[in-house]
Design a protein with these regions (language model features):
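Thiamine diphosphate
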Residues: 2-153, 158, 179-181, 245-250, ...
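Flexible, low-complexity linker and terminal segments
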Residues: 2-23, 150-294
Length: 294
């Protein structure tokens, strides 16, 4: 089935916006960011990320290498190998898939990356199609890796590029954690031309890092802690997004990810949106926090 935007846009070869599923928006963000390699293992709510990448690749004649891997560990290691050679890469899976990939993922957090590495892990609170409701943010805390938590399809697309930039700035893998209600929601999404794919070149050996023995792992752990501390002090990352409300309010609601949409609905239904007052309560200032650090 073709993507919905292909039906509703009049000029398919000159698109500036599309009405996209969250996973389609993530796929588009991956293409626009100049990603070289993407590997995935299917599982709701993440499957459409790779499916959309296949269509974007064909439509835009993009050189990205795509792979349905035999499992999530192989998908992650395929993407990580490309990153070690200097290429931008993505691994995509659902949250229980990160259990399978966890051995490699935990080690990669210590070793770091060369090219930007984004791990798209779709969570399924509910659950709708999963055996657990596990929260990937706890895995990020466990591995000491940053995680971006989008609240809408458009934000998910924008966060793909942000995740690549964060990964390359601090040389760490970055998790993107869209929930089912982001993955399978639709929204008008701005589109941009893809960035050029940079040739990664040959892999550069460094056994004290890429094949580090425990002695050097201690050094890498110290470096990882220093990276996290630097990220905490990074004003561009620490600044939350103001979504709605009045900055003079006495009450602030701090939300993260897909729950932000539910909170906005509740605020509006109670007549508190846009600084209004109802039932004698103070107006509400609604913020959204989109990044978590270990």
């Amino acid at each position: 089935m073709p993507l919905l935007y292909e039906k509703v846009m009049a000029h398919e070869n000159d698109l500036q916006a599309g009405f996209l599923l969250g996973n389609e928006a993530i796929g588009r963000g991956i293409i626009e960011a100049g990603c070289s390699v993407a590997a995935a293992y299917p599982g709701t709510p993440s499957s459409e990320v790779m499916e959309s990448l296949v269509r974007w690749k064909k439509k835009l004649d993009h050189p990205i290498y795509l792979e349905w891997s035999i499992n999530e560990k192989v998908a992650f290691e395929t993407a990580y190998g490309a990153s070690l050679a200097g290429a931008r890469s993505v691994a995509a899976m659902k949250m229980v898939g990160l259990n399978v990939a966890s051995d490699s993922f935990m080690s990669a957090a210590y070793l770091g990356v060369r090219g930007g590495l984004v791990v798209v892990v779709a969570d399924d609170p509910g659950p709708h199609s999963s055996q657990t409701e596990q929260d990937t943010r706890f895995f990020a805390w466990f591995a000491k890796a940053p995680v971006l938590d989008p609240s809408t399809p458009a934000e998910a697309k924008d966060m793909v590029l942000r995740a690549f930039e964060l990964s390359e700035k601090y040389l760490v893998p970055v998790l993107l954690r869209p929930c089912l209600r982001v993955c399978h929601a639709r929204q008008n999404v701005s589109l941009a031309p893809p960035r050029p794919v940079v040739d990664a070149g040959p892999f550069k050996k460094n056994w004290t890092r890429w094949a580090a023995i425990p002695r050097y792992r201690l050094v890498l752990h110290k470096e990882l802690n220093e990276k996290l501390e630097a990220m905490r002090k990074d004003e561009a990352l620490a600044r939350p997004y103001l979504v709605a409300g009045n900055t003079d309010s006495k009450l602030a609601l701090i939300t993260s990810g897909s729950v932000s949409s539910h909170v906005r609905d509740i605020v509006r239904s109670d007549g508190l949106a846009d600084g209004d007052m109802a039932a004698g309560r103070d107006c509400i200032c609604l913020w959204q926090s989109s990044m978590a650090l270990a």
